[in-house]
């Protein structure tokens, strides 16, 4: 419940900051073109790891919550995308903003999601990525530079999405 109030406040704040160019949407947000800072991500159903350990390959970061309908809607397409490119052309990870770890873990188990997921209870990644509404998917190049941010549910394994990902990363998929 508290998370929803924070998200509502974030939406209202976003409306205000969109009127003033150059302002970030969340405290400490890395804008498109900026390089993500290194943080330790707390693993869900897997080990914790540093964000920097994923450098060297293009990275797709999906910010989600178990209570978010659009997040759940697109999660299957992210799973299929991660399986399709399992051999290392790109990495796909999820960042849960759930207040309660057990809810996120239960959702992952029940939905059969196998790509690496982490929890962000201290809002470090949520703020750095600018996740003032969900879902948010961030495309990050091999050096950690933010290439694009997409809000809202998307069919990430569709031909159109794969072509868009390939264009951003300048790779052939």
Pin down the residues of each PLM region.
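N-terminal export signals
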Residues: 4-24
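N-terminal "domain-start" segment that seeds a small globular fold
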Residues: 23-51
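Short loop/turn microsegments at loop-to-beta-strand junctions
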Residues: 37, 59, 134-136
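Short, ordered coil/turn segments that flank beta-strands lining enzyme active or ligand-binding pockets
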Residues: 44, 54, 142
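Short active-site neighborhood of thiol/selenol oxidoreductases, capturing the structured segment around
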Residues: 52-67
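Structural microenvironment flanking redox-active thiols in thiol-disulfide oxidoreductases
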Residues: 72-111, 121-128
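Thiol/disulfide oxidoreductase modules built on the thioredoxin-like
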Residues: 109-113, 121-164
């Amino acid at each position: 419940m508290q998370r929803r109030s924070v998200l509502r406040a974030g939406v209202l704040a976003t409306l205000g900051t969109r009127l003033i160019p150059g302002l970030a949407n969340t405290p400490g947000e890395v804008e498109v073109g900026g390089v993500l800072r290194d943080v330790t991500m707390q693993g869900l159903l897997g080990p914790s790891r540093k964000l920097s350990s994923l450098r060297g390959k293009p990275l797709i970061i999906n910010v989600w919550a178990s209570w978010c309908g659009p997040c759940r809607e697109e999660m299957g397409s992210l799973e299929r995308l991660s399986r399709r490119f399992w051999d290392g052309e790109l990495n796909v990870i999820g960042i849960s903003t759930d207040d309660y770890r057990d809810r996120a873990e239960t959702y992952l188990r029940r939905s059969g999601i196998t790509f690496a997921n982490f929890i962000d209870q201290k809002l470090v990644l949520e703020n750095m990525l600018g996740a003032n509404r969900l879902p948010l998917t961030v495309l990050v190049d091999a050096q950690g530079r933010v290439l694009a941010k997409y809000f809202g549910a998307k069919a990430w394994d569709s031909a159109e999405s794969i072509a868009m990902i390939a264009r951003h990363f300048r790779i052939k998929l």
